[in-house]
Swiss-Prot record:
NCBIfam families reported in the protein's UniProt record: Dxr (TIGR00243), PRK12464.1 (NF009114)
Pathway assigned in UniProt: Isoprenoid biosynthesis; isopentenyl diphosphate biosynthesis via DXP pathway; isopentenyl diphosphate from 1-deoxy-D-xylulose 5-phosphate: step 1/6
The organism's taxonomic lineage, starting at the top: Bacteria, Bacillati, Bacillota, Clostridia, Lachnospirales
Keyword Thylakoid: no
Binding site residues for NADPH: T10, G11, S12, I13, G35, R36, N37, N121, E123, G202
Protein name in UniProt: 1-deoxy-D-xylulose 5-phosphate reductoisomerase
EC number: 1.1.1.267
Domain of life: Bacteria
Gene: dxr
UniProt keyword terms in alphabetical order: Isoprene biosynthesis, Manganese, Metal-binding, NADP, Oxidoreductase
Binding site for Mn(2+): D147, E149, E218
GO BP annotation list: isopentenyl diphosphate biosynthetic process, methylerythritol 4-phosphate pathway involved in terpenoid biosynthetic process
SUPFAM superfamilies in alphabetical order: 1-deoxy-D-xylulose-5-phosphate reductoisomerase, C-terminal domain (SSF69055), Glyceraldehyde-3-phosphate dehydrogenase-like, C-terminal domain (SSF55347), NAD(P)-binding Rossmann-fold domains (SSF51735)
Top EC class, one word: oxidoreductase
């Protein structure tokens, strides 16, 4: 029986991971972590009976410890708690589903503890791919992608390890504002940006999808995961979200993964790889598909993707400045402190303000993040 630890169990990916585990009943949850959602993590802890749970705040940990006093579950908090979740024994797979650069240190700890990583925290590779990927190779650790697009690429690579990749076709829905021009995005409200046409996701990633910043982050993640040059990654807007991504080989063959927009499918593939057990849910009916369409991204309107590509080409700590600026800008927008288009203004300003470091350490990555936050606090 595989033993699973989930970092970020109360978020969208975390809850769907538990849905998969619940459906099959043949995996054991050994650790859970969350931010501040005490009521949900208590319910999860009572249902799945992990050895250890962790929350972000010490006072919340005291409350949860009291709530779970009738159980044998240990409660921790903060970064120490996250690292304990990531390294707990016995454990086979660590699902990293926390948002942001908070995932870097726990992921490094999990790799050093030789845990298989089911990666849903794209920011870890965006900001620290130059550290994470060599470390995983050094420790012989597999990093299995949970993002639907990267899972699709991973699946399209199976059985083709000896064949050279010509191109990765990274698909994007285009988000709720596909087809609009920049001038039409002036008055976008939070409620508008949270209406994704195809996927059910958390608030932050839904906003990122609307700006296409998310696709930019995924480009950088794909570069590290699949060891390809940026020039080999092509973003393709595919509004139906049926083809989740594809790989073109040197002979011209294109292998793609298709399916319904259900995040449980890539989650399950990461948990059970290389097996494919049955999973409940809607099936893809080709006869009901009216058409599949493809178009190039509009980089003039969706500057977030263009800026991500610029950050990726610059390398060093610039992707960190890009990511940190976006995280803070999205939070400000969700709290109605800035306008929608200011998200991109903030990202661009922070990238220009960052002091370049070619090969940043973890501490330098986190310093770059803090510098971006400080810069935003002063200007916005």
């Amino acid at each position: 029986m595989k033993k699973i630890s989930i970092l970020g169990s109360t978020g969208s990916i975390g809850t769907q991971t538990l849905d998969v585990i619940r459906e099959h009943g043949d995996m054991q949850v050994v650790a859970l972590s969350c931010g501040r959602n005490l009521s949900l993590i208590e319910k999860q802890a009572r249902e799945f009976k992990p050895q250890f749970v962790s929350v972000s705040d010490e006072n919340d940990a005291k409350k949860l410890r009291t709530s779970l006093a009738d159980t044998d579950i240990e409660v921790g908090y903060g970064m120490d708690g996250l690292i304990r979740c990531a390294t707990i024994e016995p454990c086979d797979i660590v699902v990293t589903a926390i948002v942001g650069m908070l995932g870097i240190r726990p992921t490094i700890a999990a790799i050093k503890a030789k845990k298989t990583i089911a990666l849903a925290n794209k920011e870890t590779l965006v900001t620290a791919g130059h550290i994470i990927i060599p470390l995983a190779k050094e420790y012989g650790v597999s990093i299995l992608p949970v993002d639907s697009e990267h899972s699709a690429i991973f699946q399209s690579l199976q059985g083709n390890s000896m064949n050279p990749i010509k191109k990765i076709l990274l698909t994007a829905s285009g988000g709720p504002f596909r087809g609009r021009k920049l001038s039409e995005l002036e008055g976008i409200r939070v409620e508008d940006a949270l209406k994704h046409p195809n996927w059910s996701m958390g608030q932050k990633i839904t906003i990122d999808s609307s700006t296409m910043v998310n696709k930019g982050l995924e480009v950088i993640e794909a570069k590290w995961l699949f060891d390809v040059d940026l020039s080999q990654i092509q973003v393709v807007v595919h509004p139906q979200s049926v083809i989740h991504s594809a790989v073109e080989y040197a002979d011209g063959a294109v292998i793609a993964q298709l399916g319904t927009p259900d995040m449980r499918i890539p989650i399950q593939y990461a948990l059970y790889y290389p097996s494919r057990p049955a999973l409940s849910g809607d099936r893809l009916d080709l006869f009901k598909l009216k058409d599949l369409t493809f178009e190039a991204p509009d980089l003039d309107t969706f500057k977030g993707l263009a800026l991500a590509m610029k950050a990726a080409r610059a390398g060093g700590n610039i992707p960190t400045a890009f990511n940190a600026a976006n995280e803070r800008a999205v939070a400000l927008f969700l709290n109605k402190k800035i306008k929608y288009l200011e998200i991109i203004d903030i990202i661009e300003a922070c990238m220009e303000n960052a002091s370049f470091i070619e090969n940043p350490s973890v501490d330098e990555i986190l310093d770059t993040e803090q510098c971006a936050y400080d810069y935003i606090s002063k200007r916005w």
